[in-house]
């Protein structure tokens, strides 16, 4: 919130002691920024038990426009549609999060169908036409299929699923590696190249492979005179959130 602006908060709801908090309608207005929620139910531990509709239209702290909506189409099944979404802080939080400390945002398992015109990955890089779906079970994504475009020739895709042996398979392909790699400051001047990541996990044991092809590197930090496997391991650790081994670079 900007301390120099007036904020209006409109609430229509009620609270059941030691049970749920019900919002029939909740509206937050600040200049041209507005957030509208309908039929929002929060459980006793503040996790989301239900929401029928949510609309977001605001300029965030990075001066990026966010304009999207979430609509329930049937029980625990939602559509996320919109023109603009800034995912920069979300990506940073995911990369820095500890899975053991995962927050219980949702009370129930949900399906999220996504259709966003433009999504910013950081301050300058963005993707277009992000489409796909996520299946969230116990506040963890157990199934995913997302695709998007950098432009007409470059694309990015992300999947999570299970194979016949019940291994959790995660894949990430990006025909532009730079927007993902340059988040890690120990590598300087990274340019071009494409990225291919594969991970198989079962019983909390993960085997992963990260390939980055056809890239250019202008500068290395003093402590890494050559591009070592230790440095590569660092990228993979951040991508997966756990220790993994490199097969190829």
What is each model feature region?
Residues 1-249:
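Membrane-proximal interfacial segments on either side of biological membranes
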């Amino acid at each position: 919130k900007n301390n120099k602006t007036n904020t209006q908060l409109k609430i229509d709801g009620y609270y059941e002691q030691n049970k749920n908090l019900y919002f029939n309608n909740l509206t937050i207005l600040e200049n041209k920024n507005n957030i509208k929620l309908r039929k929002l139910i929060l459980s006793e531990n503040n996790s989301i038990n239900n929401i029928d509709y949510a609309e977001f239209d605001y300029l965030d702290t990075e001066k990026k426009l966010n304009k999207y909506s979430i609509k329930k189409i049937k029980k625990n099944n939602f559509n996320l549609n919109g023109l603009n979404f800034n995912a920069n802080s979300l990506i940073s939080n995911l990369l820095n999060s500890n899975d053991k400390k995962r927050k219980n945002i949702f009370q129930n398992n949900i399906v999220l169908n996504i259709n966003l015109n433009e999504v910013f990955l950081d301050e300058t890089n963005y993707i277009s036409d992000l489409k796909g779906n996520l299946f969230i079970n116990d506040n963890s994504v157990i199934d995913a299929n997302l695709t998007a475009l950098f432009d007409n020739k470059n694309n990015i895709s992300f999947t999570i699923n299970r194979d016949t042996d019940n291994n959790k398979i995660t894949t990430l392909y990006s025909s532009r590696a730079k927007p993902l790699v340059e988040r890690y400051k120990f590598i300087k001047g990274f340019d071009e190249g494409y990225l291919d990541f594969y991970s198989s996990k079962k019983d909390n044991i993960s085997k992963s492979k990260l390939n980055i092809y056809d890239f250019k590197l202008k500068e290395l930090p003093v402590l890494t005179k050559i591009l070592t496997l230790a440095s590569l391991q660092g990228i993979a650790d951040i991508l997966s959130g756990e220790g993994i081994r490199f097969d190829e670079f």
